[in-house]
């Protein structure tokens, strides 16, 4: 599963990147990579440590309290949190994702389960910081 972060004014940003110095382009790369790493960490933290006020059930003699609808998924086996990956895909690009099919079902809901969002709230939280990092990296060429 992966979500894309769309930036309004992308054409202007791309034009600024083409004009930017090598140092500014490197700084943008650092901003992108740092933000992606931080985003991954926040998603994992939400899954591992978020509130769990849903149903309690026992499986294999071990009891687990699930998350309630609207809460981040409550970690059970650790498989979901462990599946969250960060990859640098280029000098100024990165992805954060999960290869688990049920990651999307938990985030957005499915026919059997209400949404348990962790990704969207994490993206919403980090977006202002990401924009500030890009502005700082590009300096006056971004304005």
Where are these regions (language model features)?
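Short, Lys/Arg-rich flexible segments
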Residues: 1-143
